């Protein structure tokens, strides 16, 4: 078989799969900023990274699985946390629950409605 034809077929096959890949729905630009701000506030309130880690969902881009609501009032995140390594325990044993409301533009913490023991 012609090497050039073989290479062209390989390229066509590899490119053919690209159309099947779907991009994740785009997030508002403010959402990842808001998520980072909320996570950093929880870290600060709970003793810093030496003694606290937020749930893994808060490290995902935009923290969509920790996002309770998105409205004209802002982004409300709710997540658990605990000492470093809590999520690797079996079963995971978080010790704290935090809710943080961040402005619609992702620039300011508007409120921390709850930060304390898991309810």
Q: How should these model regions be labeled?
A:
Residues 93-119:
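A short, surface-exposed interaction/processing loop segment used at functional sites
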Residues 1-8:
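Bacterial N-terminal signal peptides that target proteins for export
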Residues 8-16:
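Bacterial N-terminal signal peptides
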Residues 54-101:
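Exposed beta-strand-loop-beta-strand "reactive/processing" segments of non-cytosolic proteins
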Residues 24-30, 41-45, 75, 79, ...:
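Central antiparallel beta-sheet cores of small beta-barrel/beta-sandwich binding domains
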Residues 18-24:
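Sec/Tat signal peptide C-region and signal peptidase I cleavage site
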Residues 12, 27, 66-68:
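Residues embedded in well-ordered secondary-structure elements
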Residues 24-61:
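Short, non-transmembrane alpha-helical segments in secretory-pathway proteins
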């Amino acid at each position: 078989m012609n090497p050039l034809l073989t290479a062209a077929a390989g390229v066509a096959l590899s490119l053919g799969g690209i159309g099947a890949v779907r991009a994740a729905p785009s997030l508002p630009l403010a959402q990842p900023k808001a998520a980072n701000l909320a996570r950093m506030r929880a870290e600060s309130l709970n003793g810093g990274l030496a003694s606290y880690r937020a749930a893994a969902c808060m490290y995902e881009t935009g923290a969509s699985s920790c996002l309770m609501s998105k409205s004209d009032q802002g982004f409300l995140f709710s997540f658990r946390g605990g000492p470093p390594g809590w999520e690797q325990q079996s079963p995971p044993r978080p010790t704290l629950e935090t809710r943080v409301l961040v402005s619609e533009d992702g620039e300011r913490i508007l409120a921390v409605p709850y930060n304390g023991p898991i309810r």
